[in-house]
Amino acid sequence: MKVTGLALVPPPTAADLPKVTPELLASVLARYSRSNEGLDAIMAKVDIANPEASIDRILKFVDYGHASIGGLTGGLAIALDGVSMWLAYKIFEIAQMADGQESSTRYITMDAANVPTAEQLGIPTDLASRWRDIVSRSFAAYHAEYARLDALAVAQPDLVRLPPDAKPIVVTRLRKNYALDRARYFIPFATRTNLGLVQTSRMWAVTVKHLDSLPHPEARAAAALIRAELIKQSPRLTRHSFAEKSYEEQSRQDLAASLSLGLARLSSVPLADEVWVQVERTTAPFLAETQSVAEALNHRGNRYAQQGTATRRMRVSFAWNNMAIAELRDLNRHRTGHRYTPMIQAGFYLPHEITPAAHAKLLADQMALTRELMQRGSATYVYSLLLGAQTPFEHSTHGDKFIYEAELRTGMGAHFRYADHLSAALRAFFAQVPEARAWVVEGTAEPE
């Protein structure tokens, strides 16, 4: 694992603008809101060569981690190379205010060498060899199915749903995607990936505090490395980034709930799809909603356009019983509202193009290892999971955000499986909000 902080420098066109460090910016703007001096008078106290003394002169509240001040640092960029897919998932779950990107699965090395060591992850020593064996066999299954599906797509190009007049380079890319999108369920959740995030110092402090409070050695190691980079740009606010009792206790309870449910439901049999959608449209008696859903939606030119209050005030909660981790990694990045999963294996998804019986021994051994880790109460059971593991997943948000997600995740370029999940959620949504059907653009996940 390698963690790197990136420092922004102004472009040449901004050479004449006042210069501040992230925490100096927070101090200046905090003072700006607590005086009537005007910006020029405050900036006159700034010595960019000595930002710490400048902060002391302007406003020291930045020391105390006040949320209203810690968010004024602007975005701090951090890149994490070589973290497990699980840790990348967890960081996106925690860092809800961050802008970020993770390496696309198609660019990741699919090899047992591209996985952290058992020691780095905290896998119990006596189970390490079994875990390494599962990882190696899982990658072998991935490569075997990928090669078979790629050859099948060459022999039967209609399977790929190629656009008319597609150029050879596009044909090759879509064929490779066809194979990857179906073979990926054998990829270990422990596989290394990379991610980069940008968020304020305040939110970084919360993220690192949360990571430092988790029982996973990898998470705590990441917390220490991120903190070491943050100190270079935001030393005062980084003081508030250490493990804290409430975070540790909630993490302990979360793990206990996952272990209990995970052992009760552990299975490698695919779960039939179930979806649950709850729409809440009640309003305060003194602030009724008067706009129609049609009027809230019919002025949009695309999914990024503004929606009206009829959908923006509507609360929508939705959940699936069997979201494979492969799809969950994408849906987890929708930042609005709250997302929750116990991260268990209640079933195992394979597309119809793959015969489960051919991999029955691998999945039985993988499930046995997961059970052993769970029975020991080990948080490292997550590293025994493959991307085909199916877990319940819940997301609560507002109507406009749900509609955006449904249109995005069924639209062009969407993976066929999460398009299935969002289409099912849309059907349940339309049953409760039928007037939205004419205005929501449900896609067909055509390749791009």
Task: Please identify what each model-predicted range represents.
Residues 1-448:
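A conserved ligand/cofactor-binding region detector
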